[in-house]
């Protein structure tokens, strides 16, 4: 659903306006006519609140309109997002690497059209859920900004003494393994790689590699470790890190990653800060290889302001409270999204 009165839409220059086009009317639908993912072929948006604006359907889209006045405003966008409709699209979409549909393909598909009163109720419910999801997204983003501001102001923008990461912790290199070491056996050693890391998040263990190779004792991840991407073809990804919250004693890291191990509770937030990112950037300058990389000394030589113990306790309490709120609000977001997905599967035939 796109609200033309409030959502930001792209504009085109007058000199590239096509000679022939059809302007959107209230309730018209735009379908994606091609995608590399069958789930996104015929992905649809319904346009609301046009208010006389000159809006056209863009490249690789199909402009749809209810010419028989069988539907109410707001219903079509959800009907065309339903599981029932997309099952039909996946069956008829053509292509190998890129899948596509044509206007003629829509003659082979259908959506349920209940009474207009029933359509209005369905649209009202799903619009309300979408608005709540949007509100939840804003709450989450605001909490992230608040946490980041506290880290920058109370942990990084302080004068006085400083300390190096090497003063309060150690660095451990990742495990080197060969392709033949990789296995499907989930009892084998779990390898965490760069794709499992993201600033401000815990290590994501959903897509991991299992290997028949035993890491050293120090290479086994422990709860509280910080996993760092040390080398990557994209310099923007070098230095990204995540906190390891598990105590499974079965996981290690790949050769392009490293472990920073410390008992200092502030470090995991310092390593999300702009000060940390600037030091990563400075360490990468002068490299001339195809792969941007850090070494252990680059991490251990990074410096940050030294915070008094009494002050640090109150900062820890505040940031942990924000992180708990983030966890709760992300969970609530997933529940709303799950509810919407369930309704899109069950309410349309």
Q: Which residue ranges define each predicted feature?
A:
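Non-catalytic DNA-recognition/assembly elements of restriction-modification systems
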Residues: 108-116, 153-175, 301, 306
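Sequence-specific dsDNA recognition surfaces
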Residues: 1-30, 166-181, 195-226, 248-249
């Amino acid at each position: 659903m796109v609200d033309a009165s409030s959502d930001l839409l792209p504009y085109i220059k007058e000199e590239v306006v096509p000679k022939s086009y059809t302007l959107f009317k209230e309730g018209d639908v735009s379908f994606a006519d091609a995608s590399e993912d069958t789930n996104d072929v015929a992905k649809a948006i319904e346009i609301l609140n046009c208010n006389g604006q000159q809006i056209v359907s863009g490249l690789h889209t199909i402009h749809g309109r209810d010419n028989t006045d069988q539907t109410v405003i707001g219903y079509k966008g959800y009907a065309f997002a339903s599981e029932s409709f997309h099952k039909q699209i996946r069956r008829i979409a053509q292509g190998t690497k890129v899948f596509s549909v044509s206007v003629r393909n829509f003659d082979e598909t259908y959506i349920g059209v209940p009474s207009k009163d029933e359509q209005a109720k369905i649209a009202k419910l799903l619009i309300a859920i979408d608005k709540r999801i949007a509100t939840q997204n804003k709450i989450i983003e605001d909490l992230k900004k608040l946490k980041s501001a506290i880290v920058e102001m109370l942990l990084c923008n302080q004068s006085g003494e400083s300390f190096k990461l090497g003063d309060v912790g150690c660095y451990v290199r990742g495990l080197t393994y060969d392709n033949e070491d990789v296995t499907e056996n989930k009892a084998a050693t779990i390898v965490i790689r760069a794709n499992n890391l993201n600033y401000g998040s815990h290590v994501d263990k959903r897509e991991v590699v299992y290997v028949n190779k035993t890491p050293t004792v120090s290479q086994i991840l422990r709860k509280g470790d910080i996993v760092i991407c040390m080398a990557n073809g994209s310099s923007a990804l070098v230095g990204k890190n995540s906190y390891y919250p598990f105590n499974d004693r079965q996981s290690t890291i790949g050769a392009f990653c490293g472990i920073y191990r410390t008992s200092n509770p502030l470090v995991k937030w310092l390593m999300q800060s702009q000060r940390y990112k600037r030091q990563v950037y400075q360490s990468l300058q002068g490299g001339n290889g195809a792969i941007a990389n850090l070494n252990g000394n680059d991490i251990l030589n990074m410096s940050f302001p030294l915070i008094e113990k009494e002050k640090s306790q109150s900062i820890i309490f505040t940031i942990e409270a924000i992180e708990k709120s983030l966890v709760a609000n992300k969970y609530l977001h997933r529940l709303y999204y799950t509810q919407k997905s369930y309704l899109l599967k069950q309410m349309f035939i």
